[in-house]
């Protein structure tokens, strides 16, 4: 589906524009590699201090666009209260906001958060024991791996604290 989305290039800070371009490219790469899951996955990027100052703001995909449709100008800029900070015809994905605002709040040093449903990730998450230390590759990630039990679609703000607690300090 084609959308007539006007360019934001000349109306945002150059640092924001570059972040938008990079994040849109990331979305396209995730689509290319088959890591997206219709509209049920999301990627966000924290806006730099040069754009947001001391406010915590991030860019996230608009709800309803597939990853291969996302452009730099279609990304939605939000604050930590889910207020859209620019005029956009697209809503914010509620689950995307809950997950990403929780992660950006817990990890202010993280510039980008990717939530994907890769086949391998889904297969591991379906196993009661998760990743087992049965190969060199699996032991590489064990120390920085965290699990959060599925509670349904993450649309309630009260899930943020549990997500943050499960994330812990290792990630």
Predicted features along the sequence, with ranges:
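Glycine-rich flexible loops
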Residues: 1-171
């Amino acid at each position: 589906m084609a959308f007539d989305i006007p360019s934001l290039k000349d109306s945002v800070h150059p640092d924001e524009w570059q972040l938008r371009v990079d994040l849109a490219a990331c979305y396209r790469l995730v689509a290319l590699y088959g890591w997206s899951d219709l509209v049920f996955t999301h990627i966000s990027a924290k806006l730099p201090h040069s754009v947001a100052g001391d406010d915590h703001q991030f860019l996230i995909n608009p709800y309803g666009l597939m990853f291969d449709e996302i452009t730099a100008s279609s990304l939605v800029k939000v604050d930590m209260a889910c207020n859209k900070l620019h005029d956009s015809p697209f809503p914010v994905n509620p689950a995307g906001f809950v997950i990403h605002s929780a992660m950006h709040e817990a990890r202010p040093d993280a510039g980008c958060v990717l939530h994907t449903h890769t086949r391998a990730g889904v297969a591991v998450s379906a196993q009661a024991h998760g990743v087992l230390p049965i190969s060199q590759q699996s032991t590489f990630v064990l120390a920085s791996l965290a699990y959060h039990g599925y509670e349904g679609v993450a649309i309630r703000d009260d899930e943020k604290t549990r997500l943050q607690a499960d994330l812990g300090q290792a990630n």
